[in-house]
Regions:
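C-terminal amphipathic/interface module of NAD(P)-dependent oxidoreductases
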Residues: 307-344
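Rossmann-fold NAD(P)H-dependent dehydrogenase/reductase core
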Residues: 3, 22-251, 329-343
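A short C-terminal helix-loop "cap" of Rossmann-like NAD(P)-dependent dehydrogenase/epimerase domains
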Residues: 193-197, 254-267
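Terminal signal-anchor or tail-anchor transmembrane helices
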Residues: 1-27
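C-terminal helical subdomain
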Residues: 264-306, 317, 321-322, 329
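C-terminal/domain-terminus segments
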Residues: 230-232, 236-238, 297-313
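Active-site rim elements
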Residues: 200-208, 266-272, 306-312
Length: 344
């Protein structure tokens, strides 16, 4: 009996050790960089929850002033309440931001300029995924929120960065799963009404396309800033696969999903990152010396990684041309010259 108990305890101990080792491997590295952010102004979209909130908290600890652009005021207020350090809380501010509303984005930028002058870092962190096909001003909502809204926001801020500015776009490594033929169909003139998405709407494919667009935005805008001699570097960051409710909230609609979610829980605990670890690569790109940051580059697990063919500038130019066409077709930015100039 004693022997059986010892064997059982040994097995349990071994499983726990393996679980911990695998979990630590899945979490990826912590950034080994720290940098004083005193007097730095950082704007982050979707900074009130998940990896955005952890990014916000770390930046505050380093001395930055952080403006969270969020759509949900209740969630933003909860985020502010979660910051216990009074000194840090005094440097954190919430402003309403709806990335599918050009007028709101414009007023958001103008208010920040009037209150803070120029900014140092823009983190395009916000992301959404809509289960059902939905249009907003003629544009599919996931694409509008995750990409087009951030494109508009970035363009409106371009002239209002302090020297050595940074734009950080959060994307996903799943961008690699998009075939060039799929991108060509998506960016064709026949898809200006998003008809490609209407039939057999695949919300995951649409989400991945919107994140590929973030990679393309970094490539295109980084190249534009270099050519125009604008002192800004633009990068993409894959935060990792995060064990939070982002996708589970979208699909929580059936007993099938509940069972699948329950069965996947051990795998997520082992292989997915928590929110703190998910923020590390974004923070790495905030704290890295500006000269070492690769303009247009893609970062994963606190390291630079070469883009695959689908993410390169040649394909980025196709997608940005598509963006221009849908913006003009739907009169999204009312002919705003600050935005339209990047398409020339």
């Amino acid at each position: 009996m004693f022997f059986e108990i010892c064997v059982a305890l040994f097995v349990i101990f071994t499983i726990l050790v393996l679980f911990t080792l695998i979990s630590n491997w899945g979490n990826g590295p912590l950034t080994d960089l720290t940098h004083s952010m005193k007097d730095k102004i950082v704007v982050i979209t979707g900074g009130s929850r998940g990896i955005g909130l952890e990014t916000t908290k770390d930046l505050l600890r380093q001395g930055a002033t952080v403006i969270m652009g969020c759509r949900d005021s209740n969630q933003a207020n909860k985020a502010l309440e979660s910051i216990s350090n009074l000194s840090q809380k005094s440097r954190c501010f919430y402003m309403h931001l709806d990335l599918t509303d050009y007028e709101n984005i414009k007023s958001f930028v103008e208010e920040i300029k009037s209150k803070y002058g120029k900014i140092d870092i823009l983190i395009n962190n916000a992301g959404s995924c809509f289960r059902n096909f939905t249009l907003s001003d003629g544009i599919e909502l996931t694409y509008f929120t995750n990409h087009l809204g951030h494109l508009i926001l970035s363009c409106l801020f371009l002239d209002d960065f302090n020297p050595k500015g940074r734009i950080i776009n959060l994307v996903t490594t799943k961008y690699k799963r998009v075939w060039e033929s799929t991108l060509d169909k998506f960016t064709s003139n026949s898809n200006l009404d998003f008809s490609y998405n209407r039939k057999g709407y695949d919300w995951m494919k649409t989400y991945i396309l919107s994140k590929l667009a973030g990679v393309h935005l970094s490539q295109y805008l980084g190249d534009y800033c270099t050519n125009q001699k604008i002192d800004i570097k633009v990068v993409s960051v894959h935060p990792g696969f995060i064990n939070n409710h982002f996708f589970r909230d979208i699909e929580k609609h059936s007993i099938y999903w509940f069972i699948r979610d329950f069965c996947q829980t051990p795998y997520r605990w082992c292989m997915f990152k928590d929110n703190v670890m998910g923020a590390q690569t974004t923070l790495h790109c905030c704290y890295m010396e500006w000269e070492q940051l690769s303009n247009g580059g893609y970062y994963r697990d606190c390291h630079y990684e070469q883009l695959t063919h689908i993410g390169l500038l040649k394909n980025a130019q196709k997608l940005i041309a598509f963006d221009k066409a849908i913006i003009e077709k739907n009169n999204i930015v009312k002919g705003d010259k600050k935005i339209m100039q990047i398409f020339k």
